[in-house]
Amino acid sequence: MCTSLTTCEWKKVFYEKMEVAKPADSWELIIDPNLKPSELAPGWKQYLEQHASGRFHCSWCWHTWQSAHVVILFHMFLDRAQRAGSVRMRVFKQLCYECGTARLDESSMLEENIEGLVDNLITSLREQCYEEDGGQYRIHVASRPDSGPHRAEFCEACQEGIVHWKPSEKLLEEEVTTYTSEASKPRAQAGSGYNFLSLRWCLFWASLCLLVVYLQFSFLSPAFF
């Protein structure tokens, strides 16, 4: 039974994608708020997503904020004999920095973000549980809003000792290209206009003023002789 709309969406996307990736095996997704990093039972594998994008809503003061550093922990186990697998998942919460309450708030995510994160999970699952080449991990840099620096004192994952690393080196080249081209558009547009305060233009205007003064002096100078 789903405890929230986001939980239902996670399970829906996971089951649909696993049906395509591994149709011969049965997999389940369990939300476990008590999951601990690196505390694994025998045979279990771990995948840690450190750069998810989510929106938080304070249940006390109604403040909302966006974060591009949502941490999600997955523990995975495959029983090859039974052809059944299990994934336990924990989305780490954040504290509201506006009201200062000690209440931890959950994040909500767009379906498109969940789909990309499930793709990452399946990539890791194929590598660790099936010993296959899972391919490249997806990190949606271009779709992330600028939410400012990460504030570790309000992050549940940071308080439990999880260090935020930079995006994975397996970032898809086409996503980097898309992000770079999109980010360069405003700069290119801004650079296409004339900056009349630049050094080049200042020198031009100074030279023009000197020329005007020189011409005026040249025309007026015969009157003094």
UniProtKB/Swiss-Prot annotation:
Q: Which GO terms describe its biological process?
A: detection of chemical stimulus involved in sensory perception of bitter taste; protein insertion into membrane; protein targeting to membrane
Q: Which residues lie on this side of the membrane: Extracellular?
A: 220-225
SMART domains per record: zf-3CxxC
Tissue expression: Expressed in circumvallate papillae and testis.
Q: Does the keyword Signal apply?
A: no
Zinc finger region(s), 3CxxC-type: 52-161
Q: Which residues cross the membrane?
A: 197-219
**Record topological domains on the Cytoplasmic side:** 1-196
Topology of this chain in the membrane: Single-pass type III membrane protein
GO MF terms listed in the record are: olfactory receptor binding; zinc ion binding
User: Which keywords describe this protein according to UniProt?
Assistant: Cell membrane, Membrane, Metal-binding, Transmembrane, Transmembrane helix, Zinc, Zinc-finger
* GO-annotated cellular components: cell surface; plasma membrane
Q: Which domain of life is it from?
A: Eukaryota
Query: Where is this gene product found?
Result: Cell membrane
- Can you state the subunit structure given in the record? Interacts with olfactory receptors.
Biological role: Specifically promotes functional cell surface expression of olfactory receptors, but not of other GPCRs.
Which family does the entry's similarity section mention?
Belongs to the TMEM7 family.
Name assigned to this protein: Receptor-transporting protein 2
Q: State which gene encodes it.
A: RTP2
